[in-house]
Design a protein with these regions (language model features):
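Aromatic "clamp/platform" in nucleotide-sugar-dependent glycosyltransferases that forms part
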Residues: 262, 281
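Short His-centered aromatic/hydrophobic patch
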Residues: 87-93, 112
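A conserved mid-protein helix/loop that constitutes part of the nucleotide-sugar donor-binding site
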Residues: 14-19, 204-227, 326
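A short helix/loop element that forms part of the nucleotide-sugar donor recognition site in Leloir-type
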Residues: 182-200, 364
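Short hydrophobic beta-strand element within catalytic cores of glycosyltransferases
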Residues: 298-302, 311
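Donor nucleotide-sugar binding/catalytic pocket of nucleotide-sugar-dependent glycosyltransferases
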Residues: 52, 138-186
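Conserved acidic donor-binding segment of nucleotide-sugar-dependent glycosyltransferases
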Residues: 313-314, 318-325, 334-339, 354
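Glycosyltransferase donor-sugar binding loop
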Residues: 35-39, 176, 209, 213, ...
């Protein structure tokens, strides 16, 4: 079977689709990756697949550019003669599915990992973009084989838009690499070495890892840090870009928080922390939360969709009110004060994370693909 993975970014395929790709290749399927050429082009070669770079202006709303990109993608897909296409993210899930239909690809799967900033932002521009995205999804619903969701909330939203029940499949999480993310005790010497390197005082570490977007709860994290800065080192890790929804560098350099930028050593930072925090406004099924849980860390997350599915309140973490920095600080404070509670939550978190091994998630995808192909052969 010839299987294509279509994405708007190389990072998405490299970090979140690799386990599925490896599972397909292990059983003899041919895999082709289709992405715009970006900084992950070289790293994707590690997956030993054919890589096709296609044209995509990610941020463009110009209809002429969008149409030109669409025709180019349709022609590329038609030339590949794929049996199955897996897409992810809004443009791939809509234009990709429609292009695949014109290219006569028989099996088309769309993955919704979250609705994104356009469904959080209240500006007039975002409202218009939402209308366009919703319209395109309604078209894609007719032609996709299945829509895969990482949480029930997003499935319910698309169901309300008109997606038929038989086309809905929920596979929670994209999976965690449990060979990389697992509990590993950190010695006092290691922790002190880290604190000294970054000129931090000898205090507990409260860590947040996310893109520096306002809707990830960056402001609430910084405000909570201001309230608790005498009690803990607050560390924020995450890259920023020119997106208007990103926090400014001036804001991020606030003295109450140690901003470390984008890092590749996140597993080491997670193991160093005492409390992991994600005060997001909306999530799909947060990978960083699951990675922190896999490393046996108690988490404080917002009581928003996506986060409440990844963390069970008072069992493997705590919920804080979305957008409420005071409540967030109180929940963090509770874990800083109660070491026994923190340890119990962390133990449960590690146990729960075992259910989301990326290899098990990959098996679920392959089973879904195979069932679709077999059903089609019987018709």
């Amino acid at each position: 079977m010839r299987v294509g993975f279509l994405s708007h970014a190389g990072a998405s395929v490299y970090h979140f689709r690799a386990s599925i790709i490896k599972a397909l290749k292990a059983r003899g399927d041919e895999v082709i990756i289709l992405v715009p050429k970006d900084e992950y082009a070289k790293r994707l070669e590690e997956l030993n697949c054919q890589i096709i770079f296609y044209e995509l202006k990610r941020s463009s709303l110009n209809p002429l550019i969008i149409f030109a990109n669409f025709i180019h993608l349709k022609n590329v897909l038609k030339s590949l003669k794929l049996d199955l296409l897996q897409t992810s993210a809004h443009k791939s899930n809509t234009f990709g599915i429609l292009a695949a239909t014109l290219a006569k690809i028989p099996h088309k799967f769309a993955l919704v990992e979250g609705l994104g900033s356009f469904y959080i932002d209240t500006s007039f521009k975002s409202a218009l973009v939402r209308l366009n995205i919703n319209f395109l999804y309604k078209l894609a619903f007719k032609f996709a084989t299945k829509f895969i969701f990482v949480n029930e909330s997003n499935a319910a939203f698309m169901r309300a838009l008109g997606l038929k029940e038989e086309k809905i499949c929920v596979i929670k999480s994209v999976g965690i690499n449990l060979k990389k993310f697992f509990p590993l005790p950190i010695s006092k010497e290691q922790k002190h070495a880290f604190l000294n390197t970054h000129k931090m005082p000898d205090k507990p570490i409260v860590l947040m890892i996310a893109r520096a977007l306002w809707h990830k709860g960056v402001r609430e994290f910084y405000e909570a840090a201001e309230l608790l800065k005498e009690r803990a080192n607050f560390i924020f890790v995450g890259g920023r870009d020119d997106n208007i929804s990103c926090a400014s560098m001036e804001f991020l350099k606030n003295k109450a928080v140690f901003y470390l930028g984008a890092r590749s050593d996140v597993v080491d930072l997670i193991r160093l922390c005492d409390v992991f925090v994600l005060p997001s406004y909306k999530e799909g099924f947060s990978v960083t939360i699951m990675e922190a849980k896999a490393c046996a860390k108690a988490c404080v997350v917002s009581d928003c969709e996506g986060c409440v599915e990844a963390v069970s309140n008072a069992y493997d973490g705590l919920w804080a009110k979305t957008g409420d920095a005071i409540d967030l600080s109180e929940k963090i404070s509770l874990l800083l004060d109660d070491e026994k509670l923190r340890a119990n939550l962390a133990q449960n978190a590690a146990k729960e994370a075992l259910k989301y091994d990326e290899n098990e998630i990959a098996r679920k995808y392959l089973k879904l693909y195979d069932e679709s192909v077999k059903k089609c052969m019987k018709m």
